[in-house]
Amino acid sequence: MRHPKFGELKKQIKKNKPVFITYAVLRLIVVLILIRSLFRADYQSAFYCVLTLILFFIPAFMEKNFGIVLPNTLEIFILGFVFAAEILGELNCYYLTIPHWDTMLHTINGFLCAAFGFCLVDILTRNKNLKFSLSPIYMAIAAFCFSMTIGVLWEFFEFSADCIFGTDMQKDTVLTAINSVTLNPSGENSAVSIKNITTTVVNGERLPIDGYLDIGLFDTMKDLMVNFVGAVVF
């Protein structure tokens, strides 16, 4: 006798075959990388693999528990984005080797999250148990706000990971000029400008960079700005 859940699962796979194939292939790749990382005692890479597997599960979790039916194309884009960000970006060092990889991903993230937020609001407005409706303009605003909120929460996550696990998810930026109140010799609450910075010395050792090392602020603000652009484009 065929189990009813197996029959239902088979129908879902047949209905969403492109999504299932994409999910299965990417998940297999990540699991293999995870196993290799554990054998090599590379626990930071293993952390990124586990994070990727968790993020892969989010679209299915939202569909199952909240009734949010995502278009197949959008779901494939989400899976591809997660793989590109964590596996290609972090483990394969695309953030360092491919110019603007981080900027491109955060722009796409803004677009995808706005689309996801729009689907969520649309489903809520169609729910007969909820007595509210939104005009298209307010739905667009809600989708935009949802996208920006996800962008901010992701930056919180990156900051927390850097502080707790010693990662460097908030990438560094080399600057040649800074403005600082702390470095004002008079102690007044006015910024002093330091320009044409060419070297940075830490504990008497010169760092191999041609300027001052910003450890995440510029990267975070740039990420939020391009997330904003992606959300507005949607």
Identify the role of each PLM range:
Residues 106-114, 142, 146-188, 214-234:
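Alpha-helical transmembrane segments that form the membrane-embedded catalytic/substrate-binding core
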Residues 40-53, 76:
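Structural signature of hydrophobic alpha-helical transmembrane segments
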Residues 84-96, 120, 124-125:
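Membrane-helix exit/interface motif
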Residues 61-73, 128-134:
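Membrane-interface helix-boundary motifs at transmembrane edges
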Residues 1-16:
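Short, Lys/Arg-rich, polar N-terminal cytosolic tail immediately upstream
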Residues 50, 69-80, 103-106:
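Cytoplasmic-side transmembrane-helix entry/capping segments in multi-pass membrane proteins
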Residues 38-43, 65-68, 91-101:
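Membrane-interface helix caps and helix-loop-helix hairpins in membrane proteins
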Residues 28-33, 80-90, 148-152:
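Aromatic-anchored segments of alpha-helical transmembrane domains
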